[in-house]
Amino acid sequence: MAPHLNIVPSMFVLLLLFISASKVQSDAFDVVAKFGAKADGKTDLSKPFLDAWKEACASVTPSTVVIPKGTYLLSKVNLEGPCKAPIEINVQGTIQAPADPSAFKDPNWVRFYSVENFKMFGGGIFDGQGSIAYEKNTCENREFRSKLPVNIRFDFLTNALIQDITSKDSKLFHINVFACKNITLERLKIEAPDESPNTDGIHMGKSEGVNIIASDIKTGDDCISIGDGTKNMVIKEITCGPGHGISIGSLGKFQNEEPVEGIKISNCTITNTSNGARIKTWPGEHGGAVSEIHFEDITMNNVSSPILIDQQYCPWNKCKKNEESKVKLSNISFKNIRGTSALPEAIKFICSGSSPCQNVELADIDIKHNGAEPATSQCLNVKPITSGKLNPIPCSGPVPKTPSATA
C-alpha cells in the first residue's frame, strides 16, 4: 500500500496560514518608491531588492516586498531568513539576468534560503536571457556548465507558496527546490527553446510535501525532474512540451543518495517530448531505492517514449555500460495513459539484471504509434502486473541490447 500522502492537509494548512496573515495589515516595501530601484533595464536591482528584503524580513508583522511593473536588471541576489513574521514578494515586473554567462561565478542568480511562511506571486517574469549560454553548453564544457545559474533557487524553505510566476530562458534549470518542506508551486509558466540544454523546468531533491499544480512547462530538458530524497509529492494538471517529459531521476550516479518514495503524477498532458512518464537510473555507479511511484490519467501526444523505465540511462555514453544499475525499483504503476507515440516503442521497461523491478503495474493503457507500424512494448528483467485494456500488448517487442543515449 502506498504511504499516506500528507499533501492535502499540508496545502490546507498553507492556505490557512496565508489567509490568517492577510487579515493582518502587511507592511509594503516597494523597491522603487522606498529603495530607489529603477525600472530601466540597466540599473542593477540587487541592492534595492536586498535592502527591501532585509527590512521586510526584520519586521515583526507580515510584510510584502513589491517589485512594480517595468523591466529590471538584476546581477544576482541571495535572500536569506529566518524572518520574524510571514513574508511575501509581489513580483509584477520583468527581472532580467545579465545575458553574458561570464557574469556568473557560481550557479546562483535568485536564491531564497532558510525562510518559513513565504509566498511569492504577482504575475512577474524572471528572464534568464540564456541564449548565449545555450550555444556554449556542451557535454565537453563541464567547467562552463558548472557556473551557469539556476533562475530561481528555493533552499530550506518551510510552508511556502509560489503562484503566478514565469521563468523564461534560464541558463540552466529554471527552478530548483532543495531541502524544502510543504511547498506548493502553482499556475507557473516556464518557457525556453526546445534545443536549450539542461534547462529542467522544476527540479527537486531532499524535499517533502512538494506540490506542483496547474502549470505550463515548455523547455529543453525534463519538464519536471525528481531527485533523491524526495517524498510525498503531488504533480497534477501539468502541460509539458516540448521537453523531456516528467522524470524520476536520474538516480544512482552519486554515493549515499536518499530514497525517492510516495510520488503521484496525474491529470497531465505531455506533447512533442522525447519522453513521457519516465524513471531513469545509471548503470553501475551507486545504490538507491525508488518506490510508490504512480502515473495516472495522462495524455501523450506524439511522445517518442511515452512510458519508460530506463535502468541503463547513459546520456552522452558516459557510464559503466557493462554493469547493472544498483537502484532498486518497486511498487510503480502506470494507469489510464492514452495518446500517441512518435516511435513504435511506446512502452519500455529496461530494469536491472541484478535488482529486477518489483510490482510494476500497467492498467488501461491505449497508446497508438503515429506511423504505419503498430505500437510495441519492450521488457527486460520485469514481469508487469496487468489489467484493463492494454495497447500495446505488454512485453510484446524485442529488448534493446545497448544503454539508451537519450538525456
Curated annotation (Swiss-Prot):
Enzyme class: hydrolase
Disulfide feature: 223-240, 351-357, 379-395
Organism from which the protein derives: Gossypium hirsutum (Upland cotton)
PbH1 repeat windows: 180-206, 207-228, 260-281, 290-311, 357-384
Top-level taxon in the UniProt lineage: Eukaryota
Active site, UniProt feature: 221, 244
Keywords on record: Cell wall, Cell wall biogenesis/degradation, Disulfide bond, Glycoprotein, Glycosidase, Hydrolase, Repeat, Secreted, Signal
Record's function text: May function in the depolymerization of the pectin in its walls during pollen tube elongation, or in that of the pistil during pollination.
GO BP: carbohydrate metabolic process; cell wall organization
Molecular-function annotations in GO: polygalacturonase activity
Protein name from the UniProt record: Polygalacturonase
Keyword Disulfide bond among UniProt keywords: yes
Glycosylation sites: 182, 267, 272, 302, 331
Keyword Cell wall biogenesis/degradation in annotation: yes
Family: Belongs to the glycosyl hydrolase 28 family.
